[in-house]
Amino acid sequence: MATISDVAKRAGVSVMTVSRVINKSARVSDDMIERVNRAISELNYRPNMVARGLATRHTHMIAYVFSNLANPFFAAVSMGIQNACAEKGYTMILFDITSAERFNECLDTLIDRRIDGVVFHHLDVRQENVDSLRSNGVCVATIDNEVDLEGVTSVNGDDYEAARMATRHLIDRGYRRIGCVHEQYEDRSDENRGKKDYIQLFQRRIWKNRTRGFLDEMRSASLEPVCMIEGSGTADIAFAEDKESLQRILAPENRPCALYCENDIIALAVLSESMRQGIRVPQEIAIIGHDGLDYGMMLYPRLTTVCQPRYEMGSLVAHRLIDTIEHKSENEIIFTHSAVVAGDTT
């Protein structure tokens, strides 16, 4: 197995120069970089990442921490993070958080393993968590965190404006009897923690902003919602299996002409039940979702949805986090922009 000394000898440079090229820790001429990289390739040299971490005080590892591996929303985000990490020479590791205990274990692991940075997604990270991580050398970024934080880079979806956009799409197509399927809005106080499934404690901010956007756009058109229906579970797979709620939405006496669903899995569940009952879409009920999951475009009729740039969110947050780790930028708050993708359901 080749060593760093072998690389230095083959390239005709010092071991220190090879180390500087590998770690990008100092200015080295282009000629030196080319010679070292050629020697590395010829010898099939693989740097010792543990030793590299000790030398540079960086492990070149980024953690992506989220709360529901079964939710397809996270796949494109993780791909964006993964590709950005690979581009910059970092490795991504995943944590699927399913309990408060698991969250605390995750925080300890991030510190113990000297992870350079972490992206928390759709969680309720608190300021004390951030302060603890940063004091131990872990940089922090978030996507759609429940509360605003200091000392982090935040990438957030434009949930309020996107919901208005979805509602305006329905109104512009002549629909007036419009309803909404929203999520639960329990108080986020600490005494409520542990009383419900851990995952259900999060994403309240998202649902509130989407509902507020829907209601404000309806009011701007001098319209009142036909119905405001609260989804069950976590507004994903659990709701899709809740036949009672679906049948209540689609009952002839309650059925709106159009329905804004606050995520795509709810929308696909409503679409599936409509097709099962023989209800014509969009002739008898129009449906628009929110998020832009690939599933919606694979089916027929194709789901009309507000598409969030999920891959771009992941790529953006990872690049900004790595820049922070490498002291190339300060923390910032960034809002992404969604767009309506018209399918066959409106």
Question: What kind of feature is each model-predicted range?
Answer:
Residues 1-59:
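N-terminal helix-turn-helix DNA-binding module of bacterial transcription factors
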Residues 49, 75-76, 105, 272, ...:
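Generic recognition of short, well-ordered alpha-helical segments
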Residues 42-48, 99-102, 122-123, 271:
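Short gly/ser/thr-rich secondary-structure transition/capping motifs
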